[in-house]
């Protein structure tokens, strides 16, 4: 009984020796184990999306290293509405169908094609794969005692040796796994009702026998549609153009959308397209706000246009594009990465995600069910419950409240899709930030065709309003922590009255670096009993206020003493300000980041997007280098005293052991 687990479910585990990859035969064997896992996952997701499996809310197969030379391979499904019998039936049926019919050649070809494309992309993009990825692969190679293969070697070996992997060889591998005696069933439950519905060991074995003797129908692979059709507007055009700075251009399209074009100084072959909408979940009423991120997640898992979720995965691999989205309070970001030698698929994808997004009914039902389960079990996850209480305490706004089960149930897949589409319903409220080394002429044709053809919706969304701030100080204590540690947080809110510009923000950041160091030295290193400490400043440009979060984990009996010490450290540092040496260190670190930023497509795109959201100016960041040189100790300390001397409100909270 795992109280902190969000879902109930049943799993079958096998334990078996790790394959030590040291020759071609072991390379093939390792690939076969990996493909069995992928084939199971692909089929399970397809059957959930198609509505064939409505009795479960999800599932997965995985291989996990459990010892230097041993692995665990498991197959798990998640129950819906605590129904453990349905979950057991679903898993037994999946396993028995594979026992009887194996996997089809079409399924195997699809997995091979997608994986080979990913490996080929890794070879093509080797120059951009950073040092962390290289060290991670080196560490993995060392840990698993396997030869270190370059992306090129891995791709060429896979391309040649995977031809020996057939549905017959995988069927033999599957039977080898199923005959493995080192196996056990596990049922995970997070509440008493699910525990009562759990099957007895005898019932599990009887069910396994029943399905082994059942004649089950073979799975029919639905195939892949790999075409994405986009209707272009022949009337679309660029209505104005403005140079904002060197290598930074602003275009306005005839549909009202704005496009910012930037070139990076590096050699990357990457093109980043980010749509920034000035609508986010705060544009929605309290009854919907907390479901908008869930709707966005459902869209991401449902495919776009004519492409199903699985087809989109394959299409994206073949066209070297990736897509992600994020909903925040006042904005929604939709990011697509493409290649400079083939930028068109990136534009096609972002157009279709905005104009022809879909939500699969079965995916929505699964996510909805998971959200309800998470709500029901919130009491069992004290850290999450504590964070939610602190969030509600800092605001006097219904939009901070969690929805109840009846409100979640009322929100249909059609409602979720309509809400998600509203985030990008008005082109005039979208700015597209495009970063990469592609000629402007080539980009202009793609921008006009794919971004200029986005139409204005019939139901545009009003801009959101910031959360209403609580006006009274408050304190929260939750005594539900399962671990013998205390989690403490203190939020201080400062009213800036005027928008915080980039120069002020840099002064505040320089001060916070020095403050964080003080807190670390005084609390964590000298006053033992604190395990971690952090200091974070954030600015809300719409609400025109500044928040400072002090957070630490410590021995439960010492949280009051350490808070007093932390506040003394903050008062002393505010009175003292920062020194010349500390400012120099800050300037050097920021300058290093700026140098890297100019060469990195992703970092430059993030900087422009942040500039747009924080300062409503896509070119604000271009002043950073000059402002950095102009910073003085006096200016920093004056700004800090002006903005951080008088908190308007203080909210404290502590999560203590039971």
State where each predicted segment sits.
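Active-site recognition of the HExxH zinc-binding catalytic motif
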Residues: 37-38, 289-297, 513, 517
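Long, His/Glu/Asp-enriched segments that create or flank divalent metal/ion-associated functional microenvironments
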Residues: 33-37, 520-524
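M16 family metallopeptidases and their MPP-like homologs
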Residues: 6-26, 44-162, 183-189, 267-300, ...
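Peptidyl-prolyl cis-trans isomerase
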Residues: 165-169, 173, 358-359, 364, ...
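Conserved short beta-strand edge segments in small beta-sheet-based binding/regulatory domains
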Residues: 360-366, 457-461, 577-578
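Proteolytic maturation boundary segments
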Residues: 1-26, 30-31, 38-49, 109-113, ...
């Amino acid at each position: 009984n795992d109280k902190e687990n969000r879902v109930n479910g049943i799993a079958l585990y096998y334990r078996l020796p790790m394959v030590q990859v040291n020759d071609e035969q072991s390379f093939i064997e390792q690939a076969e184990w990996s493909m069995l896992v992928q084939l199971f996952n692909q089929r399970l997701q397809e059957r959930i999306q198609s509505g064939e499996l409505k009795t479960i809310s999800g599932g997965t197969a995985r291989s996990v290293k459990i010892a230097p030379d041993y692995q665990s391979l498991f197959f798990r499904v998640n129950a819906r509405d605590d129904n453990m019998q349905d979950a057991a039936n679903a898993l037994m049926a999946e396993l028995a169908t594979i026992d009887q019919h194996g996997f089809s050649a079409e399924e195997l070809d699809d997995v091979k094609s997608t994986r080979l494309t990913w490996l080929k992309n890794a070879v093509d993009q080797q120059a951009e794969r950073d040092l962390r990825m290289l060290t991670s692969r080196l560490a993995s190679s060392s840990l698993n005692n396997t030869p270190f293969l370059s992306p090129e070697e891995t791709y060429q070996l896979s391309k040649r040796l995977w031809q020996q992997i057939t549905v017959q060889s995988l069927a033999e591998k599957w039977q080898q796994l199923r005959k493995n005696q080192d196996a056990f069933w596990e049922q995970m439950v997070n509440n008493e009702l699910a525990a009562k519905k759990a099957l007895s060991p005898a019932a599990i074995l009887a069910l396994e026998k029943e399905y082994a003797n059942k004649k089950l129908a073979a799975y029919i692979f639905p195939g892949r549609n790999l075409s994405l059709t986009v209707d272009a507007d022949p009337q679309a055009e660029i209505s104005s153009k403005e140079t904002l700075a060197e290598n930074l251009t602003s275009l306005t399209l005839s549909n009202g959308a704005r496009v910012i074009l930037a070139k990076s100084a590096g050699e990357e072959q990457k093109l980043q397209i980010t749509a920034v909408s000035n609508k986010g979940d705060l544009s929605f009423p309290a009854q919907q706000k907390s479901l908008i991120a869930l709707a966005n997640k459902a869209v991401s898992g449902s495919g776009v246009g004519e492409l199903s979720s699985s087809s989109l995965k394959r299409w994206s691999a073949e066209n070297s594009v990736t897509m992600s989205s994020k909903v925040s309070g006042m904005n929604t970001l939709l990011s697509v990465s493409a290649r400079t030698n083939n930028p068109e698929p990136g534009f096609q994808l972002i157009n279709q995600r905005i104009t022809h997004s879909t939500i699969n009914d079965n995916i929505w039902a699964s996510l909805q069910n998971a959200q309800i389960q998470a709500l029901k079990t919130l009491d069992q996850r004290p850290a999450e419950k504590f964070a939610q209480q602190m969030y509600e305490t800092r605001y006097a706004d219904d939009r901070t409240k969690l929805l109840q089960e009846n409100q979640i149930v009322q929100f249909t897949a059609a409602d979720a899709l309509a809400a998600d589409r509203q985030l990008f319903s008005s082109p005039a409220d979208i700015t597209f930030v495009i970063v990469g080394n592609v000629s402007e002429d080539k980009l202009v044709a793609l921008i006009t065709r794919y971004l200029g053809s986005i139409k204005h919706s019939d139901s545009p969304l009003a801009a959101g309003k910031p959360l209403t701030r609580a006006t009274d100080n408050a304190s929260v204590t939750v005594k539900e922590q399962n671990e013998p540690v205390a989690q403490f947080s203190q939020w201080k809110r400062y009213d800036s009255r005027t928008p915080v510009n980039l120069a002020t923000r840099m002064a505040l950041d320089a001060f916070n670096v020095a403050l964080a160091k003080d807190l670390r030295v005084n609390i964590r290193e000298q006053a033992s009993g604190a395990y971690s400490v952090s200091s974070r400043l954030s600015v809300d440009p719409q609400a025109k206020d500044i928040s400072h979060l002090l957070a630490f984990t410590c021995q439960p009996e010492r949280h009051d003493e350490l808070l007093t010490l932390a506040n003394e450290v903050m008062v002393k540092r505010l009175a003292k300000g920062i020194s010349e040496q500390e400012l120099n260190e800050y300037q050097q670190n920021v300058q290093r980041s700026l140098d890297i930023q100019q060469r990195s497509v992703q970092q430059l795109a993030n900087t422009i997007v942040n500039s747009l959201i924080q300062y409503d100016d896509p070119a604000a960041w271009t002043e950073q280098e000059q402002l950095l040189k102009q910073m003085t100790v006096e200016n920093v300390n004056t700004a800090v005293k002006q903005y951080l001397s008088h908190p308007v409100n203080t909210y404290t909270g502590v999560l203590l052991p039971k």
